[in-house]
């Protein structure tokens, strides 16, 4: 298998964590007899400095000519005075729009070894493994009309979806549920919102195509509570843009650190992958960044763009093994290093690479 990946490391800790993820990807590819062609381009603040724009034309062209785009992080305090459409984050929004992905995949899982990092009790989070599928191009964030009328003191936004928009993201969610534990929870507010009534009716319609998947519906307010007191009850969670934004961020407490979470945006011309954490400029270049979210993002690339399930699972198992062995980055040690070996960004990347290699060689 040959996979062409554009790496846009971006700003802050982006280059550090992305570098460690790429070394793991290379190791896995070599061991499996696969070829990964890597191409590096600028995006975000580094592109503003060197190219005068957050998304250079050659970066976008390279993205559209790739099998996957691997983004590190964008942003920095020195760019906050720029107009919004000139800031690093604008480059991310532009590349997302150009690639056309409409389904955002965000895993939320609990590592037994990190239960102490979660504000929830260990017996609640242990064993939780949720995949959020969030519709990314419709809903309140994109609906029109939208306006803030400062003269009248009024503002309004429009939550709008078409049946086709709901169908396409729902099919992806069901297909993913078929590969997992065959349960799908659709989240809406159908007791109040007409757009949610369309959403629920459409999900039920598509469900007929997937009789092997169990379907349930939850109101978003109830779901926000259930996520915190019974997260193990959920497998694939499907929802619209606003609700998905809020719920997937809330679910980060299950894992206990944003540095552990990967994400993927699929369904468009080219899939876009990025760890959930930001650019964290305050720790950039100090070896303090947690690369595990980026490494797990690499696993998503292999799974969703390469079709390499065994290799993706090996990376995920390698991360778990390293945590079981007591290795931590500073954010995971949380000032209490008793019994842990605290590693730098590069050391953690090397430890995961070594562990994954050992597992694949001995498989």
PLM region spans:
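Extreme N-terminal starter segment of soluble prokaryotic enzymes
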Residues: 1-5
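Glycine-rich phosphate/diphosphate-binding loop of Rossmann-like nucleotide-binding domains
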Residues: 6-23, 27-29, 150-221, 233
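N-terminal glycine-rich phosphate/adenylate-binding segment common to multiple enzyme folds
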Residues: 49-156, 242-244
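Accessory "access/gating" subregions that flank catalytic or transport cores
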Residues: 191, 199-200, 204, 208-262, ...
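Glycine-rich phosphate/pyrophosphate-binding loop and the adjoining helix
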Residues: 137-138, 142-180, 184, 190-192, ...
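N-terminal beta-loop-helix "entrance" segment that forms/cooperates
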Residues: 31-57, 225-227
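Buried hydrophobic positions in well-ordered alpha/beta secondary-structure cores of metabolic enzymes
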Residues: 11-14, 67, 133, 173, ...
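Glycine-rich phosphate/nucleotide-binding loop
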Residues: 45-48, 228-327
